[in-house]
């Protein structure tokens, strides 16, 4: 293998004329040393003294030679290996796990770098994989450095790293853009501290083959002298442009690979491999099938065979057979002859990969690249907040990266499946994810970093300092979501983080909705482990629960055995178990919770029985349940990450562990179901949808609508979903339809704010500072409290009339009241939380479980409604049979009365009951502690009791019919 061009003289550009023939790496190292005080350089005073951009063509050694030589600035290469390095490290970030791991291992095994020993002076750190020294050259995914910048102080980062090399800096993932924002802010803060902070400022190097040097240099405020251009490829790459485009790129890719194989049958195995890029795993599977069929034809013709290796992020994480085949030498690989079933040596490997092989990966035997020219990424559309995986033409910069996989060790060939004319029409650079996806999970981090620079401590959109700020509609949507979640509030001078928002901003990777759902879990006394599991299922299963199935033909019925493996014991022996569970829960997310519980039961069982090779037995268990083992492991890891995040910010991740849904009995099951649904509702309330009986569609507050059908649950009135997905209508046309990802039915479980679901009105000046707002007109009597009730408050027996409240009025209380109540909320506190609406008029088809409910029912028409009074603590004691009986008893003229006898509130409930019944002879000296006493009062008012239950001497549950 020849030397990288960084180590060969005469490849420098954009440097003084006298240095054009220098060895690039020597020039770069000298340039850096001239700016380091320990080598005689001046103390840095600006970003120009600490930021360098290197644009270096693929194959130049920017991912291998550059980090090693930078590390040698800190540690002489002739230092004996037994001498432990104790200085600061060099971190080199990579956009993907594969490249981070591969580069570290390759350098550790290379004879060119004898001083670089894996685990001693060089290593890697990714989320799933780590093998690194405490100090040295560390290859890491961008997410690792991002998390450190998020959680560590400037001094802690400076004490850990002397150099930060951001490789493939042209990639515009959300995390990379945020990481650059963090780095720039950190450098500016340390420079502002003068010489004390400047002496240890880390040196930042941005490298890429296709970086927009003007854009990045402008962002960091540096000049042309901070940009070094290096020519890359040592060998030529021939591009074979087709005459026509293809309308079936998978089939054409297979035909092209087969043609290459047959026409180059005399290739040496060490210079023969083919790499084919595909946009997703579905295409990889289909193409792999076609190539394996082609192997059958080759066997019939008695020609050498191909070894097909499908590679994606999952293959890398598991280090499966295909990944091991990629890393092995070709001479050690075998392929089975499909005719004789005998193994033989393959002529070449055909690697079918997603974009994980696009950057930073060197396959020394690679000679051919086939590129269909497509890229698949998430796109989100605002204000509807609907998104999905969209397949579009790849940008020219990405195509150059793909082309750059060959021509490193010997001449290569590039086969695009599109014409040169098409290539010239597509965008030069990829769109940043912050444009295509919006700020997403990094929004609160953007807010915090922007507030740090604001003298008044408020968030102003125009002050966001990123390579590209979020689009206005995406930013407005993110602000709205944060306000609704109680994480952001409008102060006198602008938008500010609430105390909940401050806690949420400390999470490394939880979105606004995920953070809110965790907080709601503490408010409502839910088992936080259940909350974490639900969020992990949403993250891994992505669109639908059936994505957890390891089967090509996926449907909900196939989930039955997996769901039943995790349900509570008291439900396991009922008839038509899965159908009844599906009907009872009416919730995809809770079914996902039970699927994971079953997997967890299996883990505990195998460990307790001390079986050998637990992983093998778990795989077999998943196969029996038709589940993807890899997906279940990912849920386990994601769940652990969420629980760790909670612990890091000081919250108890095992809060209410004893109240997990899987451990419920007949008396507590429905209460826990309601609690979890309440948490989902509070987290995703912007994604609540009501059924329109006229249009036969579900509609939401943003005006979007979609159809939803369930074989068992017929047209529920109100549902909530974590996200609205764009799903392709057909494979032939670029058309999509809207559909919910997971569905949680709220009917009969949660008190939904109907007014909140009305079509939203434009929010004036949502991106600017606070303005004087006109007083809102009173809302209809059915909404007694405004939909933005801010926090807990002690009721102390006063009625709302005594508090001089009006319909539609907003109540504001110090949010410290809320924070101080986490996680143990006193029972005598009226449980009205952030953003919880209070209303009382609902369709009779719904049995509402709510934690707080107040009404003032003077002059209210009771048409098709069930009226509620009081706190439904007793409702939590209803069994499943009670629930079913009650559900069928309710009629349009029914009257549901739920009562909790807290002494401090008794006077108020009597007052409210008196107003509601229009009956002014209720004796205040009565001791309303028994069902008969309450029945007497209601009979006097013309009501007949039809159902009653008294779980304890202090709790009553009665249904009356007019």
From Swiss-Prot:
The keyword ATP-binding applies. InterPro entries: DEAD/DEAH_box_helicase_dom, DNA/RNA_helicase_DEAH_CS, Helicase_ATP-bd, Helicase_C-like, P-loop_NTPase, SAM-dependent_MTases_sf. Induction: Expressed in the late phase of the viral replicative cycle. Residues 253-459 form the Helicase C-terminal domain. It is found in: Host membrane; Virion. It comes from the Viruses. GO terms for molecular function: ATP binding; ATP hydrolysis activity; RNA binding; RNA helicase activity. The chain crosses the membrane at residues 521-541. A motif (DEAH box) lies at residues 167-170. Residues 43-229 form the Helicase ATP-binding domain. Its EC number is 3.6.4.13. It holds the Pfam family DEAD. Keywords: ATP-binding, Helicase, Host membrane, Hydrolase, Late protein, Membrane, Nucleotide-binding, Transmembrane, Transmembrane helix, Virion. The keyword DNA damage does not apply. ATP binds at residues 56-63. Gene3D superfamilies: P-loop containing nucleotide triphosphate hydrolases (3.40.50.300), Vaccinia Virus protein VP39 (3.40.50.150). It is a single-pass membrane protein. Belongs to the DEAD box helicase family. DEAH subfamily. This is Putative RNA Helicase B962L.
């Amino acid at each position: 293998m020849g030397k990288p061009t960084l180590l060969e003289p005469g490849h420098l550009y954009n440097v003084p004329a006298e240095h054009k023939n220098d060895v690039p790496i020597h020039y770069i190292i000298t340039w850096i040393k001239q700016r380091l005080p320990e080598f005689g350089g001046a103390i840095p005073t600006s970003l120009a003294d600490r930021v360098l951009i290197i644009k270096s063509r693929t194959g130049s050694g920017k991912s291998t030679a550059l980090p090693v030589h930078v590390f040698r600035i800190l540690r002489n290469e002739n230092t004996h290996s037994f001498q432990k390095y104790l200085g600061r490290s060099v971190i080199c970030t990579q956009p993907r796990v594969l490249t981070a791991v591969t580069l570290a291992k390759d350098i550790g095994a290379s004879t060119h770098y004898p001083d670089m020993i894996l685990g001693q002076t060089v290593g890697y750190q990714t989320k799933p994989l780590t093998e690194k020294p405490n100090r040295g050259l560390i290859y890491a995914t961008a997410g690792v450095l991002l998390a450190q910048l998020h959680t560590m102080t400037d001094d802690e980062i400076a004490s850990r790293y002397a150099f930060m090399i951001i490789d493939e800096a042209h990639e515009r993932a959300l995390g990379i853009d945020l990481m650059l924002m963090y780095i720039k802010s950190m450098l500016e803060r340390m420079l502002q501290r003068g010489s004390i902070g400047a002496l240890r400022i880390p040196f930042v190097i941005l490298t890429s083959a296709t970086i927009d040097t003007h854009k990045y240099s402008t962002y960091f405020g540096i000049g042309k002298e901070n940009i070094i251009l290096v020519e890359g490829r040592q060998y030529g790459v021939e591009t074979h442009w087709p005459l026509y485009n293809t309308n079936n790129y998978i089939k054409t890719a297979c035909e092209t690979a087969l043609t290459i194989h047959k026409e180059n049958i005399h290739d040496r195995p060490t210079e023969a491999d083919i790499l084919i890029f595909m946009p997703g795993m579905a295409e990889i599977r289909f193409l792999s099938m076609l190539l394996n069929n082609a192997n059958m034809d080759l066997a019939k013709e008695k020609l050498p065979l191909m070894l097909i290796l499908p590679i994606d992020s999952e293959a890398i994480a598991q280090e499966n057979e295909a990944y091991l085949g990629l890393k092995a030498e070709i001479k050690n690989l075998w392929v089975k002859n499909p005719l004789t079933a005998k193994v033989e040596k393959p002529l070449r490997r055909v690697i079918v990969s997603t974009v994980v092989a696009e950057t930073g990966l060197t396959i020394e035997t690679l000679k051919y690249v086939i590129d269909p020219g497509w890229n698949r990424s998430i796109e989100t559309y605002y204000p509807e907040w609907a998104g999905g995986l969209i397949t579009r033409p790849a940008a020219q910069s990405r195509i150059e990266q793909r082309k750059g996989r060959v021509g490193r060790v010997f001449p290569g060939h590039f086969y695009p499946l599109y014409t040169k004319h098409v290539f010239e029409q597509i965008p030069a650079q990829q769109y940043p994810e912050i444009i295509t996806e919006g700020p997403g999970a990094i929004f609160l981090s953007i807010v915090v970093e922007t507030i740090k620079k604001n003298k008044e401590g408020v968030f102003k959109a125009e002050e966001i300092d990123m390579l590209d700020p979020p689009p206005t509609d995406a930013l407005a949507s993110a602000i709205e979501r944060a306000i609704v979640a109680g994480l952001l509030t409008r102060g006198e001078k602008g938008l500010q983080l609430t105390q909940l928002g401050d806690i949420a901003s400390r999470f490394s990777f939880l979105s606004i909705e995920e953070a809110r759902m965790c907080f709601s879990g503490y408010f409502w006394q839910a088992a936080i482990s259940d909350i974490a599991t639900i969020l992990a299922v949403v993250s891994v299963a992505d669109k639908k629960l059936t994505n957890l199935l390891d089967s090509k033909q996926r449907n909900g019925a196939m989930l039955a055995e997996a769901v039943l493996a995790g349900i509570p014991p008291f439900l396991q022996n009922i008839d038509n178990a899965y159908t009844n569970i599906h009907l009872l829960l009416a919730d995809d997310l809770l079914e996902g919770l039970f699927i994971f519980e079953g997997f967890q039961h299996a883990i505990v069982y195998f460990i307790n029985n001390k079986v050998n090779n637990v992983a093998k037995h778990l795989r077999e268990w998943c196969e029996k349940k038709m589940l993807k083992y890899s997906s279940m492991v990912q849920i386990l890891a994601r769940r652990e990450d969420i629980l760790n995040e909670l612990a890091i910010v000081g919250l108890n991740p095992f809060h209410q562990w004893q109240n997990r849904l899987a451990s419920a009995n007949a008396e507590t099951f429905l209460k826990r179901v309601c609690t979890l649904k309440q948490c989902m509702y509070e987290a995703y309330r912007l994604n609540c949808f009501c059924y329109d009986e006229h249009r036969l569609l579900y509609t939401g507050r943003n005006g979007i609508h979609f159809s939803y059908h369930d074989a068992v649950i017929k047209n529920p009135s109100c549902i909530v979903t974590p996200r609205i997905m764009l799903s392709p209508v057909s494979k032939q046309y670029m058309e999509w339809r809207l559909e919910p990802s997971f569905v949680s039915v709220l009917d009969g479980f949660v008190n939904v704010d109907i007014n909140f679901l009305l079509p939203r009105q434009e929010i004036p000046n949502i991106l600017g500072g606070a303005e004087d707002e006109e007083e809102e007109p009173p809302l209809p009597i059915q909404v007694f409290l405004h939909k933005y009730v801010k926090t807990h408050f002690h009721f102390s027996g006063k009625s709302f009339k005594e508090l001089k409240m009006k319909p539609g009025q907003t109540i504001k209380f110090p949010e410290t009241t809320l924070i101080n109540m986490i996680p143990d909320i006193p029972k005598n506190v009226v449980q009205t939380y952030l953003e919880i609406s209070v209303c009382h008029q609902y369709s009779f088809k719904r049995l509402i479980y709510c934690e707080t409910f107040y009404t003032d029912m003077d002059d209210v028409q009771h048409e098709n409604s069930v009226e509620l009074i009081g706190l439904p603590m007793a409702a939590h004691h209803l069994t499943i049979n009670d629930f079913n009986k009650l559900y069928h008893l309710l009629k349009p003229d029914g009257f549901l009365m739920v009562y909790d006898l807290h002494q401090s509130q008794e006077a108020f409930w009597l007052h409210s009951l008196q107003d509601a019944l229009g009956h002014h002879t209720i004796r205040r000296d009565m001791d309303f502690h028994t069902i008969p006493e309450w029945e007497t009062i209601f009979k006097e008012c013309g009501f007949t009791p039809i159902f009653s239950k008294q779980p304890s001497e202090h709790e009553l549950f009665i249904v009356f019919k007019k």
